[in-house]
Amino acid sequence: MSDHDNPFNEPLPKSPPDRRLILFAGVMLMASLGSVYAWSFFTKPLQAAYHWANWQTSLVFSLAVAGLGFSALYTGPLVAKLGGRKLMKRSAVFFVSGYLIAALGLYLGSGVIGDIQTPWVSWLSFVVLALGYGVIGGIGLGTGYLTAVSTIAGWHPDKKGFATGMIVMGFGIGALFMSKVFGPKAMEFAGGNVAAAFLIIAGVYGVIMTLACRSIYSPHAAISSKHVATVADTYEHLPNVRVRLWLTCFTYSLAGLGIISQLSRLMQDVSKSADSSLSVEALAAAGATLIAIASLGNSVGRLIWAWLSDHFGRVNIFAALLGTAGLAYLVLPHASSPILFSILICYVIASYGGGFGTIPSLISDLYGSKRMSSLHGLALTGWATAGLIAPPFFGFLYDKVPDQAATYAYYICAGSLFASMILVFSVKKLHKHCTSPAE
């Protein structure tokens, strides 16, 4: 292989890389990063041990979401300059360091420097936790997420939808694995000490991500060159391309993140209305079950919708998932049955996940593979902004109008998705390739 074919000076295997192995390595990396979606698993133990308020533990997650989106924006242009392997190594370093710094913050608040009841000790512990898990870890999240999607898409130009769907599905599966398997086991092994559990998690993910990075190679120039779209230069002059792309991702994410933040409460309210004799424990169990099933739907939806986009066109499928999810939201206020409610919720969450599987390939088809990473990073800032706005706003609705909050939320989500669908159709005319199966 010539230097031209390996511009990043990455170590190469003796035989040609197996793109299936690279895809598997990417999924493992994303599954590690996806553990951030299971943050709520640790919130109650943290609040019990450190006496932090709900807004404090929520802020840590919001910082991680913001870190993912805005570090992805910064990482986008670097993919073409540094290559996938180098950036994924950076991602691993930041992500694992985030857990280690967070563990340090928790140890500081566990009596090392003073009583956690002392205000300055509590705040110092919280600030270090937020800096580690939220800021440092968030940088690792965005760097790895953006790089993995761009790199894997480059290796599978003939099946971009399926490949990117697999990658982002790994992110969703990682959250389910953390909340139901790894997290409980780490806490059990650590004796219920969150700081010790974070050290265990950092060690395990450090090994997994290191092995995954060793199996990642940037796409060979010959693999993707004949598939790279040439439309990017044609449409580069349009001043509103980035605005429409950002608004599409923002409005679509607003609907998903707002409901995800209230899933347990919504399910408990519906279950209690259907059977007022249910105990608090039974209601909590119903909420937890819906979260687990919806998480699985989120993961599977990322793959299925993306795979469908390979066969029926990116814009067609993206618009379909937005429109049908919007209709489901309109039905939800009238879903008094817990079973019907669960089915509708799982569908809208699966569609939310499907958007993440479809957007990277849609961007690549519209603007070319060379600009995919930078524009995908821009789109993720729309998601990050929605993550900062939607959960607090939906929580505000519950505080002010608890009896009508769910109904208002469903209609807002429906309107947001329909607005996103209109934005998608507004770019459909940019290139006919987006309305036909991928070449």
Model regions: which residues?
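Extracytoplasmic gate region of multi-pass secondary transporters
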Residues: 39-44, 240-306, 390, 394
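Intracellular juxtamembrane helix-capping segments at the cytosolic ends
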Residues: 46, 142-156, 163-164, 354-367
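Interfacial helix-cap and linker-helix signal at transmembrane-aqueous boundaries
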Residues: 46-47, 78-79, 177-191, 267-268, ...
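C-terminal ends and interior cores of transmembrane alpha-helices
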Residues: 93-122, 324-336
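Hydrophobic core of transmembrane alpha-helices in multi-pass small-molecule transporters
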Residues: 98, 111-143, 250, 340-354
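A late C-terminal transmembrane helix in Major Facilitator Superfamily
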Residues: 175, 367-402
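Symmetry-related core transmembrane helices of the 12-TM Major Facilitator Superfamily/SLC fold
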Residues: 195-214, 408-426
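C-terminal transmembrane helical hairpin of 12-TM major facilitator-type secondary transporters
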Residues: 249, 286-288, 292-362
